[in-house]
């Protein structure tokens, strides 16, 4: 008897659902795309408990005919293509006929729909893929579909869902992308009775950007437009001054379909050339109009990825369009006087909101402890070791190349460093390569030193260096009794700063400096959700945020170790970094924050120091617990002992040299 048999439709749909319906956000995406294909002008998304209880999508589109409503839930039933030729020129969001049967196979679905001119509509109810009820029902034009009891018959799938907050974040993100891709459609998104997002649907993309990323971001967007024989590129990109810590703020659409394409994302970044800081990315919304023949959308189960013809041509067009637009823009940031001189209504509104946010509100005292102004090249003195703070901060980080002993400087671990960083996507802080010596590599080790290592290190302390001069505004030349030292000034101050900040950030101190005017921070809905999840983590490093509206937070004070004049930037950098790397413990965040602060506050390459500043740097370096490496593991110094120097100048030669014995020492 044969073993092969055909699967029944319900089981086949459940298998297909494993690829198409991964989580509640997948349901939202598929249902909203169906609404867009139905020429809807308005789409309302209503979600309960992050989609775990219910997802409801209401539109004013074409609706479904009564005779088609049952067929719509059959696998591979679609109105969008009729032949294989249509598959190569698809212009609709959906076309496979998989979404509705896949959703119905793993949930409880109720759909009510009506077409224009009909006196009544039709309602259908399915559960687990089985049709339960089909009957006439009162309905306005469009479709109203509600999905409940998701994965009731596949409980194992529930185990792979993230927390409700994470699932809500993913739903919000996909709605934002769909709204950016379709500015002519009015979207609204409500969760647990609270409206989280609304767009006007007036085809003004810049307004949609402002609704998602904030009004200030919307004002700093540049409109772009470019075309060639095959492609037309349009949209908005942010000024170089407006950046984020990840690429997640870049949205690319093809014929108003949101896609993910790493090469096109790189093209957007390339268009900025050197105008972006390392590790920072723009906000961008780019739509590409092209002949459907040039794109294959049938290469991914969820259609998030596509295959493009003439991709290199498109990459060049995107990069050049952005490059030309930025080239004609005045990139000197303007001071917005309005933000410093608010009108009376704004002052009254701010005062009212402050009082509502906190029952007890007092203006910041004028006698608040001021932060000390320090020059860019002034180095904080490391404080006494505190094992409790060190333990609280140490965490697992990629194993750096660490030099524990003085003699290791004679055989530095530069070769290992080169091997690690030569393929990294991000460049090192300097364009010039660091000199290398390759006698023998030093094995990577953990940043923490055990007791034995610390005892050994005390016996091999960093030498007291006598300053000689500076090379290329980047390296300090110094000498000691055992030879020449070349010190990377950025890495040296980064190490000094790191040990200072690690101590300060590790302290949970009551010493806070009040802002004279509380700082109001605005974020997108997705970012605000992430911040709400990590308020305790931020409080642990001295940033106590309070909710101040839907996507806004208020910060009344900051740690006293913030540098004067940079308080707002420092707070925003720390919050932005947490948004990008949300999956961190408090200990890890403290460690990473200390590293970030030490790097940003260190002197850079091509910065010329006077003799006093250089000597101060060399004097404080030996006071560090580990003066041999920066926090990222890069060597601080390279050492040439006397023997190395003499060999370089042939003042001594190897014993195997045939003529070495023919010369007396005094001849050299």
Curated annotation (Swiss-Prot):
Record's GO cellular component terms: mismatch repair complex
Entry superkingdom: Bacteria
GO MF, one annotated term: ATP hydrolysis activity
InterPro entries: DNA_mismatch_repair_CS, DNA_mismatch_repair_MutL, DNA_mismatch_S5_2-like, HATPase_C_sf, MutL/Mlh/PMS, MutL/Mlh/Pms-like, MutL_C, MutL_C_dimsub
GO biological process terms, semicolon-separated: mismatch repair
Classification via Gene3D superfamilies: 3.30.230.10, Histidine kinase-like ATPase, C-terminal domain, MutL, C-terminal domain, dimerisation subdomain, MutL, C-terminal domain, regulatory subdomain
Keyword set includes Transcription regulation: no
4Fe-4S among keywords: no
Record key words, sorted: DNA damage, DNA repair
Regions annotated as coiled coil: none
Similarity annotation: Belongs to the DNA mismatch repair MutL/HexB family.
UniProt function note: This protein is involved in the repair of mismatches in DNA. It is required for dam-dependent methyl-directed DNA mismatch repair. May act as a 'molecular matchmaker', a protein that promotes the formation of a stable complex between two or more DNA-binding proteins in an ATP-dependent manner without itself being part of a final effector complex.
Protein name per its UniProtKB record: DNA mismatch repair protein MutL
Source organism per UniProt: Limosilactobacillus reuteri (strain DSM 20016)
Lineage: Bacteria, Bacillati, Bacillota, Bacilli, Lactobacillales
